[in-house]
Amino acid sequence: MKKIMYFLLIILLIVSIAISSYFIYKQLKEENEQESIFNNLSEIIQDDTENRLKDNLESNNYIKIQELYKENNDLIGWVNIENTNIDYPVMQTKKNEEYYLRKNFYKKYSSYGTPFLASSCNIDTSENLIVYGHHMQNSKMFGELENYKKEDFYKSHKYINFYTLEADIKYEIFAVFRTTLYKNNTFKYYQIIELDNEEDYTRFINKCYELSYYDTGIKPNFKEKLITLSTCDYTTKNSRLVVVAREIIGE
């Protein structure tokens, strides 16, 4: 009987190791595939830059994004924070906002997904653009937003670059905070997109300041457009980590 139990335990151990190895392999395979996709997209941009420079043409980032748009017309822009992993296309689908939550740039399943703009946002006119991305444990996608909880990281990574099909836009971060969804008394930042009223604008900014981990000293002025990066926060259930920045014009 003891020999049978011992044999069964060995079998269970082998099976559990095999299953664990499979899931690790699957995770690493997907991570490599996703990274390869983003690298290929970056190469399209780089190739376009080289070609335009050879022809003495303008090589602004928004012109490069237009090349990627030919690959997938759900592309709305590209978000970049220098010296971080955050360097990704941003998608938008009006009928199904979360379509890219589990889809890569080429519309194939991916647990990493692709950052996407809220469906209620208008890329040209909305005062607050809300971009969602996954918080991956390996710091990919919007995982590095976690670092903004530390003021020292913020000080060396103050700016968000957002390239649309029409323009290169630079934003300066002014607030970083955590909030919880699905509670009546929490800050529903994700519902605040149109801020053409000064009172509403000021109320939104003040709430961001109130919740922010630290005082950045940056004071957005009414009519300055905003961008909000949102990802999951694992501190508590249904938490979100939010980074908000104001558009820099003529600075």
Q: Locations of the language-model features?
A:
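Hydrophobic membrane-insertion alpha-helices, especially the h-region
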Residues: 6-22
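Solvent-exposed, non-transmembrane regions of membrane-associated and secreted proteins
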Residues: 20-251
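Positively charged n-region of N-terminal signal peptides that target proteins for export
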Residues: 1-4
